[in-house]
Amino acid sequence: MYGIDNYPKNYHASGIGLVNLAALGYSKNEVSGGNEGGGAPKPKAGLYPSLPYPSSESVGGMPYVVKQTSHAQNASYAGPTMGMGMPVPEAPSAPAPYPSATPYPGSGLYPSLPSANVSSLPYPTAPMAPYPTGMPYPTGMPQPNLPYPAAPLAPYPSAMPGLPGMPMPYAPMPTSPAPQHNIGFPALPYPTAPPPESAPTQEEEPSVGVAELSFTSVKVPENQNMFWMGRKATSARQNSVSKGDFQSLRDSCLANGTMFEDPDFPATNASLMYSRRPDRYYEWLRPGDIADDPQFFVEGYSRFDVQQGELGDCWLLAAAANLTQDSTLFFRVIPPDQDFQENYAGIFHFKFWQYGKWVEVVIDDRLPTYNGELIYMHSTEKNEFWSALLEKAYAKLHGSYEALKGGTTCEAMEDFTGGVTEWYDIKEAPPNLFSIMMKAAERGSMMGCSLEPDPHVLEAETPQGLIRGHAYSITKVCLMDISTPNRQGKLPMIRMRNPWGNDAEWSGPWSDSSPEWRFIPEHTKEEIGLNFDRDGEFWMSFQDFLNHFDRVEICNLSPDSLTEDQQHSSRRKWEMSMFEGEWTSGVTAGGCRNFLETFWHNPQYIISLEDPDDEDDDGKCTAIVALMQKNRRSKRNVGIDCLTIGFAIYHLTDRDMQVKPQGLNFFKYRASVARSPHFINTREVCARFKLPPGHYLIVPSTFDPNEEGEFIIRVFSETRNNMEENDDEVGFGETDDRIAPSLPPPTPKEEDDPQRIALRRLFDSVAGSDEEVDWQELKRILDHSMRDVMVGSDGFSKDAVRSMVAMLDKDRSGRLGFEEFEALLTDIAKWRAVFKLYDTRRTGSIDGFHLRGALNSAGYHLNNRLLNALAHRYGSREGQIPFDDFLMCAIKVRTFIEMFRERDTDNSDTAFFNLDDWLERTIYS
C-alpha cells in the first residue's frame, strides 16, 4: 500500500476493548436526568460492546476497522487510488517485500507508558472486524523499523505524478493497487501542478512510502470527560470578578457593611444544572445559616474533610483528598487568608491551574442545601466549609455544578497542581509498577485508581466491598515491616480512600480489623497512623491491588506545581517545555495520519533532546508528551464535548530541520517513531517514551479533519529539552514561477508603445478630467474584467476595492493616479493567476487548506496563527475562500508587512508607532 499511515479509531481503551463507562463518577445517591428520584439510570446492556484490537498473529490477514462515529460513514472502497482521491502510481516491476509488523499491545490506555523503546514501538495486536467489502489486503504490512526506517528503496523515477520535475523517493509497492477507503472526508483536489510542499529528504536516513497500521480512537461516554494561554475566558460564561479581585471586593464589602453576592455565579438553578430543572427546591444558604460557629478549617484539614454528596464528582473528591497530603500544594489552591471571623464578608477565593497559568476564582459563600443540609461535597464536621467552597469554586470555573458530573481524577489533579498525569492499565503494567509508584510518592506526586465499571449495573459492588466505576485516591505507598512465624521483611502496601467516606471499604486481607495486622509491629502502626474507623480509608497489599484494580493515575508535578523554594531544592524535578496552539477548520485542522493529504497542515513542534537520562545506561532520553485540549468541560452546556485527539512523533535529520513546516512529501515517506497509543476524547492524551538524543517533530491533531479547538502541548524530560514551533517565518518570498505564463508582459515605459497606449486609454475612460481613479470607478473596471474568477458573485465588495486603493494610495487621498493604477492591475493579475492555479475545480473558491500554498505562491509567507486569523476572517463555514476574499487576504498581508517594514529600519523585527499614527494607518487600510 502506498503512502497511507492509518490510525485506528476505537472507543475506550481500557485494556479489554470497549466497555460501558456510563457509571463512572456517579455518587451513590445521585439523581440523573430523566430518572428523577431513582438514582442514575442503569446503562443498557451492550451499550458499549467490547471491541478487540488488531491481530499480531498474521499481519497478512490484518483487516480494516470501520470507524464508529455518531455520523454515517462510507466504508466502501473506490478503486486504485491512494487516499483522498489521489492517483496511485504504477508499481515497480519488482516490488520489495514488506517487512513483518510489530505487535500493538492489546490493552492499556497508554501502553507505552512503561518507557517504551522506540526501537520496538508497539503496534496493534488482536483480531479486528474483517474488511467490510471483502477487498484483499496486502499480504504484508510495512514496519517503520524504528527508530530509522530501513525498507529498501526503488530507483527514483524522473518525476512523481502531479509534481513535474520534482524527483521523489519512490516506495516499494504491492503488486495489486492499494484500495482507497472513503472515511467520510471529501477529497480535496490540489492544483493541476501543485507546488512542492517540502523537498524530499535524501540523506543517510532512508525515505520510504509508509503504510503503518491504523490508529484507533477511544470514545468515552459524554458524561465522563469534557474540558492559547489565558487569552480567553476559562469558562463558558464571562467572569467579571473571577481573577485578582478578591482583596478589592472584600475591602469594598467591609467598607459598605454588605455581604458579597457573586453576579457571575448567582444562587440560582442555572448555577446548579443546565440540562434540566431541579426536581426539588434547593435553598442557597450561607455557612452561618447552616451551622453554628462556621469555620473554614476545624482543627486543620485532612482527607477526611472530603465527603461526597449527590453530585457525580468522585473524581474531583479523590483529587481533593490527595491535595490534603501536601500542605504547599494545598495552600496554593486554598489560600489560608480567609475565614468566617476576621474580615468576613461572605467572599472566598481559590486558585486553579488552567492551561499554563494559575487562575484565581472568586465566589460568594452561598451554598445549595436541601432541608438545611449541604447537598454536594461536605466535611464530616458540619461546621467546616473549606471543601464545600472548593467544590463551588471549581463548579464556577466550569460553568455549573452539573458540568462536574463524570470525569477522571487526573483532570482535577492537574488543575490542582499544574502537573502531568500518566495512566497505567494495571493488567498490562510494567513489572516495576510498585517502584514507579514509590518514586512518584517520593516526588510528591498525586495518585488515584479505579475499577472498570460493570456494563449492566451502576456502581456495582464487588464481593470484597470495592465499587466499580468509582474513583479512589491513593494516600500512601510504602514497604511495611512485617513479622510472622514464616516470614520477616517488608511487604509492599498501598493505602486508599473511597471519597464516599463511609463503610464502603475493602473487606479482604489487610482490611480494617483484619487478623493480618497482628503481624505488624506497634511502632509501624503508629508511624502509618493506622485506625479502623468506618471512614472509607483502607489498606491493601500491592498484590491484591494488582488483582482487583484496573487503572492507576499518577500526576507528576511540573515546574508549575512548585514554589520558588522547591524549584531550588535538591529534589529531582522535570524539565518542561510548553506551547499553545489551535486547530482551525480548513487551515490547521488536518486530522490524523489517516488523512494524509491534510495531515501536514496540523501545527508542528520540534523537540530537541540533548542528553540521555542521568541514571540510565541505555543512552536514551525519557520524554513525556502531554496534549491537552482547552475549555471543553465549561462548554458542555452548549453541547460542546471533548474532541478525539492524539499525536505522532517523527525523527528529524539535520536537513529536515531546515524545512519549516514539513509538507506532504515528508509524511508520505516517513514512518512515525512514536505516537499516542490511541486518539481519545478526554481532555488530555499523555504518553511516556524512551528516545535517543536528537531532534523530533511532534504533530498534534484531532482524529478527523476540520474539527476546531484550542490546545496546549507539554513535553517533560529528565534532562534539558528545547522546544520550538516548526512554522514559517512571516515575510515576503519569491513569486511562484508557475504563474509566469499567466501574467501579462510588463508595461513598456515608452509613451508610444501600443500596450501602454491601450492601458492609458482605459485609465482615461474612467478617470475623467481629474486624472485619478476612485474606488467606485475602479470597481466598474474590475467587476467587468474579473468575471471568469468571480463565479456566482455580483462583483467585488466595496470594502475590497477600497482596500485595493488604500494599499497603493501613499498620500491617503482616496484616489489612484496612473502609475498607481498600473501597479495595482499588475498585482491583481498576479493574484488572479495564483488563484486560478489553486482553484482546480473552477468553482470560484479555493479550499482553506490551500491558503498557505496560494499565499506562498504570491510571495507572502505566514505562520499558523496568521493563517488561522485569515481563515476566521475570510473563510466560509465550509472552509472555502472566494476570489475577492483571497484578494483581501493578499492585500492585508502585503499592506501590513510593508507598514511594519517601513518602521523596522534596522531589521530587528521591532517597529514603533504612536497611537495616532497606528490608528491612522490601520483605519485607512
From Swiss-Prot:
Annotated site residue numbers, Cleavage? N74, A75, Q224, N225
Q: GO molecular-function annotation terms?
A: calcium ion binding; calcium-dependent cysteine-type endopeptidase activity
Tissue localization of expression is: Strongly expressed in follicular and border cells of the oocyte. Ubiquitously expressed in early embryos. Localized to the trachea and their orifices, and to the larynx of late embryos. Restricted to the salivary gland in third instar larvae.
Q: How is its activity regulated?
A: Activated by millimolar concentrations of calcium.
Q: Which CDD domains does this UniProt record tie to the protein?
A: Calpain_III (cd00214), CysPc (cd00044), EFh_PEF_CalpA_B (cd16196)
Q: Where does Ca(2+) 2 bind?
A: D839, T843, S845, H850
Task: Return the similarity comment.
Answer: Belongs to the peptidase C2 family.
- This chain belongs to the protein called Calpain-B
- Which species is the source of this protein? Drosophila melanogaster
Gene encoding the protein: CalpB
